Amino acid sequence: MNISNTIQYIGVNDHEIDLFEGQYVVPNGMAYNSYAVMDNKIAIMDTVDVHFADVWLGNIKNVLGERLPDYLIVQHMEPDHSGSVFRFMEAFPEAKVVASAKAFVMMKNFFGTDFTDRQIVVGENDTLSLGDRTLTFITAPMVHWPEVIVTYDSKDKVLFSADGFGKFGALDIEEDWVCEARRYYIGIVGKYGLSVQALLKKAAALDIRIVCPLHGPVLTENLGYYIDLYNTWSSYAAEEDGVMIAYTSVYGNTKKAVEQLAEMLRKNGCP
């Protein structure tokens, strides 16, 4: 899949999974997204779940041909995205790994090594030149882990948004974005609204035309719509006006009372 003339999708779909993170039902599977940014030098954006490492490494080789990657950029250390880091570093011994300082601490714990001789530590507004383009790194702590960074490609105006703007579902299943993106946000990121708000403020200063998340489809059109939704969700505002009545009813009597209350509210103009 071409994201642009120089950015290729190299991720995988997982239809074997039934519960994402052991708790979220995903009837349409999951996508673990990864991207190849090709310039004078080549950067691979994040890895995939270790169970799909062979497929992913094959995708890299198919896209790159005779070329070899120069950098692996690790934006997020959750195992569905970092699980194949060690396999990548074995397969491409000349490549360097780019990540935040906290991410390298996690690598030491996860893999028994932090790739000391091959690491590039980045922080807020640090840059990496690939040739004709420059990647800028933006810290995004607690969106939704402490080590997270996102990456901006100033040439193609692409934001690699880590878990931001992600959704449940594999990419080979067509479905509406909002429902599963909302469920993903509430379950995965929802408690970190202030952190998301801080990241949205940083993103507002960028000219973004494409958003490449780690789950779900690449967003290329009407970005304001998606950003506005994220602003609403992360500020804990309501998408629509309305009243929710939460109840349980052992014998059915509370249900009857709730139905009467709902009817009274409707008659008084509540949506």
Residue ranges of predicted features:
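Metallo-beta-lactamase
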Residues: 2-5, 99-221
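Short, glycine/acidic-enriched loop or turn micro-motifs at the edges of active sites
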Residues: 49-50, 79, 166, 218, ...
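Active-site neighborhood of phospho(di)ester-bond hydrolases with catalytic His/Asp-centered motifs
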Residues: 45-47, 69-77, 97-100, 159-162, ...
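Conserved beta-strand hairpin/beta-sheet module of binuclear metal-dependent hydrolase folds
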Residues: 2-64, 150-153, 157-161, 243, ...
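N-terminal beta1-alpha1-beta2 submodule of the flavodoxin-like/Rossmannoid cofactor-binding fold
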Residues: 224-271
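Cofactor-binding loop segments of dinucleotide-utilizing enzymes, especially the Rossmann-like FAD-
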Residues: 12, 100-102, 163, 246-250
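Active-site metal-binding motif and surrounding structural segment of the metallo-beta-lactamase
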Residues: 40, 51-98
